[in-house]
């Protein structure tokens, strides 16, 4: 297949995610297998090696692993190595969005995300349809697994939407959450995702006129970003997707458009067992889901960021500019 559009797919990867990120890169490689003009796709990796918040136990080994990935996969590497100033995924995604003038689509990659093989074929069709119908500013999302409340049903894959949701509040629920393929806490493989997607013979494409998405694998038309929609600087880390969602709503109003590819699954492995390795002093016996939440800096940073998120629009409340200490 020859692409008519240009793509940039950017991913921020912390040093402790290095043992997980190849699965994401491999999913992109598989999605590109049938593409004739791969020069139309720019894959960018921002390797965050900063020890501002957490110390790394094996930094040189991680650099070596990055070099191996660079030899195996075709992507551009950027590095953040300042130990005296924090840099987060929200910072990177703001910068990624600003590359909108160089492409037709900006895609938010994520180190624990698997993108579907059908990615480019679907997006090419959508752009053709959109242009013929004068829809130039839009978001595209793929099907997701069972989420925690009814508001997400519009995005859930039909194979999973009627399944039960398991929290991780009790040992029993944690066990079910980690062992049920439809659960967002279950670590799904490329092969399992491919099997689900192989069942789709005809696309179920729905359009919603209000923003609803998580940031993993988010597809944004460059014209939407040219409106100025972005992640506000007041949101430092947590809530970057929610802040961007509100920005899209503010910029587009009643003209907001989002394609939902219901029956093509993308995977967000939030609870991947290799999500947090090489962090000095971290209790490796803990479940991935609970590791970061026990860190004091994380709790503080989370409160600052989410507190600002609630003040973004239609408010005169001052933002919290507090510097988070190491």
Cite the ranges covered by each PLM segment.
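Conserved catalytic core of nucleotide-sugar-dependent glycosyltransferases
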Residues: 97, 116-226
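C-terminal catalytic/acceptor-binding lobe
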Residues: 195-326
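Active-site acidic Asp-centered loop
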Residues: 48-50, 109-112, 143
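Hydrophobic targeting segments
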Residues: 5-12, 28, 42-47
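Short beta-strand-to-loop acidic/aromatic patch adjacent to the donor-nucleotide binding site
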Residues: 103-116
């Amino acid at each position: 297949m020859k692409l008519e559009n240009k793509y940039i797919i950017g991913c921020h990867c912390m040093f402790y995610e290095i043992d997980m990120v190849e699965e994401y890169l491999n999913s992109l490689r598989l999605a590109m297998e049938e593409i004739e003009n791969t020069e139309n796709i720019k894959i960018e990796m921002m390797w965050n090696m900063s020890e501002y918040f957490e110390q790394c136990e094996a930094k040189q080994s991680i650099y070596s692993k990055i070099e191996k990935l660079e030899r195996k996969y075709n992507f551009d590497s950027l590095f953040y190595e300042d130990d005296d100033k924090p840099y987060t995924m929200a910072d990177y995604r703001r910068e990624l969005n600003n590359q909108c003038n160089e492409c037709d689509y900006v895609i938010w990659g994520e180190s624990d995300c698997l993108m579907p093989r059908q990615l480019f074929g679907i997006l090419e069709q959508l752009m053709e349809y959109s242009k013929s119908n004068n829809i130039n500013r839009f978001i595209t999302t793929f099907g997701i697994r069972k989420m925690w409340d009814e508001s997400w049903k519009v995005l859930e894959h039909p194979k999973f939407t009627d399944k039960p949701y398991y929290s991780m509040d009790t040992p029993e629920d944690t066990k079910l959450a980690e062992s049920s393929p439809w659960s967002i806490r279950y670590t799904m493989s490329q092969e399992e995702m491919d099997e689900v997607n192989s069942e789709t013979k005809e696309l179920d494409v729905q359009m919603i006129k209000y923003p609803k998405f998580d940031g993993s694998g988010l597809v944004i038309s460059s014209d939407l970003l040219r409106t100025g929609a972005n992640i506000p600087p007041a949101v430092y880390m947590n809530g970057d997707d929610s802040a961007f969602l509100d920005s899209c709503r503010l910029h587009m109003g009643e003209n907001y458009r989002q394609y939902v590819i219901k029956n093509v699954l993308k995977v967000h492995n939030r609870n991947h067992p290799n999500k947090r390795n090489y962090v000095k002093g971290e209790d490796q016996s803990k479940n991935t889901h609970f590791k970061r939440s026990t860190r004091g800096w994380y709790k503080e940073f989370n409160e600052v960021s989410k507190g600002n998120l609630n003040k973004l629009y239609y408010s005169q409340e001052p933002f919290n500019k507090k510097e988070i200490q190491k």
